[in-house]
């Protein structure tokens, strides 16, 4: 579950993307993940994207690879198996497991995007990292950045 959580929080991967990720998709030299359709699996948008690795995820994946040199997949668990493990973790954390407030694996991706927006990352950059086909889907996160909008206009000065 830890690797699944790390890929969601630090790379914004969809659950299916994280579970389909193979070590050959991890470029340790240039520090990025390649999320690409394959003959046995496809991305939601059917497009390839590159997601850079920050220091924390890079170091984590490096340690994980060194401790699992023989595995092909980064996460060797089925979708259903991961779903059960994730929900068990959510329950142990005392988070909602039912109803409107239910915490799902998608919350990891949402957290990734939300934090980028709150840090002032342009929506088109967030869209590219998430693999959104356009920024319309990404605009769902724009309500999180009102202070950044205020800061942007506060810097405007005209005349004396």
Give residue ranges: language-model regions.
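Basic, Lys/Arg- and aromatic-enriched nucleic-acid-binding interface segment
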Residues: 1-15, 19, 67-68
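Conserved tyrosine-mediated DNA breakage-rejoining catalytic core shared by Y-recombinases
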Residues: 11, 20-63
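DNA/chromatin major-groove-contacting recognition/catalytic segments
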Residues: 49-52, 63, 119, 143-160
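Active-site/catalytic core of tyrosine-dependent DNA strand-transfer enzymes
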Residues: 54-100
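Short basic/aromatic active-site micro-motif
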Residues: 80-82, 98-120
């Amino acid at each position: 579950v830890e690797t699944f959580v790390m890929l969601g929080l630090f790379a914004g991967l969809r659950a299916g993307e994280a579970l389909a990720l193979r070590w050959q998709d991890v470029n340790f030299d240039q520090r990025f993940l390649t999320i690409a359709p394959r003959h046995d699996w496809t991305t939601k948008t059917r497009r390839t994207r590159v997601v850079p690795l920050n220091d924390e995820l890079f170091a984590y994946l490096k340690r994980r690879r060194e401790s699992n040199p023989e595995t092909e997949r980064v996460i060797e668990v089925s979708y259903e198996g991961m779903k059960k493990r994730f929900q068990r973790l959510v329950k142990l954390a005392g988070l909602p497991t039912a109803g409107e407030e239910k915490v799902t694996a998608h919350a990891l991706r949402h957290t990734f995007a939300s934090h980028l927006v709150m840090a002032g990352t342009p929506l088109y950059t967030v869209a590219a990292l998430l693999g959104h086909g356009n920024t319309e889907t990404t605009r769902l996160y724009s309500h999180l950045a009102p202070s950044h909008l205020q800061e942007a206009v506060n810097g405007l000065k005209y005349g004396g």
